[in-house]
């Protein structure tokens, strides 16, 4: 949303100064007009208000940038990992845990010596290494440096308050629901034939008997489709474990998997709450540790994925950023959906009209 506003900065003399503002409509309505969220795109010095097409001289550089954004901006490969970390698949970016490379893939097994690696990485050391990366003067030198230190430079490190370890939160949506929930059900229970195709039909039948309030969300209806639990979204995994899983899965699971199920359901019910208590967060953390140990002991080291490891950091992220709903990615996913729907000619015209209407000079 753009707006051109004129005001008189001086007393006793007529001198009009203009400002072109932008508000980010992606922000909630109660946030987008806060001072810290408003953008000043241009200043028009005056002393007189510009008229008609003269405004174009001021709009041109702004439009150049908007056009660039509309086309999309590709960052240099260096910034694919925006905070300068190497892929988390080979090394956790919050603690000292390094992935094991076994059977041609990485795993994060090895809970026995947790006290040795469950230690926060050192931010100061990271920043020092990042500066070292900047001093490398060739691609080969930079590659060698990354292999040794696991660190690259990121422009974000120019922010004086930025902590490259603490400020990287784990997204609970990807970690818990698209990561662990999906992994446990599909890769362990379905692939290991604990939940067979005919069992999936029974589970679906049981779920269809549930009568839940309308605002809880759609009942997942694809349990028996495809390879099982087909195309479940993160939200459907959340709903499944919070409402349906215990009743519909209980009689189909052996003892050890019942242990995984009860712990994960409890974890989900604690972590999705709007209010979290530190003692309950502590319980959730302990249960996550137990789940990782149970899976490692019963299904092997290969089954300990990055997400299972990262879930061990959710507790400390919640301490820094608040309840999980306050920093999970569901909100961004909703924006993706909205933006996708806007890409129709009708909506683009609507957006253009909205922008033009917010610039008084364009209303002839
Ligand atoms: Zn870690």
Where do the PLM segments sit?
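Acidic, metal-ligating active-site segments
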Residues: 1-48, 94-97, 247-249, 269
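Domain-level detector for long, ordered catalytic/regulatory cores in large eukaryotic signaling
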Residues: 49, 67-234, 253, 341, ...
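Compact, glycine/acidic-enriched structural inserts
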Residues: 25-73, 103, 272
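Core catalytic machinery and nucleic-acid-binding channels of phosphodiester-processing enzymes
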Residues: 1-31, 57, 61-64, 231-239, ...
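Short, conserved catalytic/metal-binding motifs centered on acidic residues
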Residues: 5, 62, 83, 92-95, ...
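Eukaryotic short linear interaction motifs
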Residues: 8-12, 29-32, 48-52, 77-78, ...
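Terminal interaction-prone segments of large eukaryotic proteins
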Residues: 95-98, 186-364
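Short coil/turn segments at secondary-structure boundaries
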Residues: 13-18, 34-36, 53-56, 80-82, ...
